[in-house]
Amino acid sequence: MTHSFAVPRSVEWKETAITILNQQKLPDETEYLELTTKEDVFDAIVTLKVRGAPAIGITAAFGLALAAKDIETDNVTEFRRRLEDIKQYLNSSRPTAINLSWALERLSHSVENAISVNEAKTNLVHEAIQIQVEDEETCRLIGQNALQLFKKGDRIMTICNAGSIATSRYGTALAPFYLAKQKDLGLHIYACETRPVLQGSRLTAWELMQGGIDVTLITDSMAAHTMKEKQISAVIVGADRIAKNGDTANKIGTYGLAILANAFDIPFFVAAPLSTFDTKVKCGADIPIEERDPEEVRQISGVRTAPSNVPVFNPAFDITPHDLISGIITEKGIMTGNYEEEIEQLFKGEKVH
């Protein structure tokens, strides 16, 4: 189900290339890039030209299918061996978002029973496209489930960009706002700018304005004052990886928002698809946290804002403990109780709230 949608797609398959919206150029320029090699795909993910856990997974899946076309062998076993090398290479691009390895693993499984190299290559393309199609419906369902938590006129805060351009369509944390717009529910979102790479100001503010959704931009340090003065009703964020107990890795600054929400007695929600859960990881302490280039902190958009040699600590993500999370919204329902128990039920196919 797709409605008229003003926000462009972040990733598209073109048979001989992958077209991505270059998110590094936003909001000043809407530029599309063609990725034709596995190196192009790796670079696009590492340099944040494409970002957002689901979009990274989709891009990597397309990248594996694309690179597989260049594997020259008639031996299926040899084909799978070379495919595994490419998979490991792409999987090393970013360590925190579990959707990346989930999508690549799913493509690997799609060739297990292939009896020829041609069949394997075809299976890879079909599976990658299917991941994107499923993600759009998943995001719509997340939005639909999240919408029941809000009422007309609510003011809701978010951080980073868990929107349409971070997924195949709609987004996770931003999905309810697109659906609310269709139903004229008048939700208003306060977007934290999200230092150091400014995904909130460059991406979330841009895409919500493209979609005609009411948005107000604030700096990260304004969050507490805004919660108090603007009577924020709730906080909703996306996720890059969710542990077995509900601990959640998301963009740096998310943990701080959760602490503030708890202090103001404001519900704090996480919105994520099942593909973001890592049931092999017991708790947040076991999730690897990517550290990025110090220059991201020393400058903004190429303009130096700090001494060139000042030491920098630049983790891209933080971990929000499960006990600060009021609910985890998925395509299968909303979890609000014992996360470890409910996550286990979810993966057994049982219904949650």
From Swiss-Prot:
- Please list the reactions this protein catalyses: 5-(methylsulfanyl)-alpha-D-ribose 1-phosphate = 5-(methylsulfanyl)-D-ribulose 1-phosphate
**MF-aspect GO terms:** S-methyl-5-thioribose-1-phosphate isomerase activity
The positions annotated for binding substrate are: R51, G52, A53, R94, Q199, N250, K251
What EC number(s) does this enzyme carry?
5.3.1.23
Entry's family note: Belongs to the eIF-2B alpha/beta/delta subunits family. MtnA subfamily.
Q: How does it assemble?
A: Homodimer.
**Name the UniProt record assigns to this protein:** Methylthioribose-1-phosphate isomerase
Please name the gene that encodes this protein.
mtnA
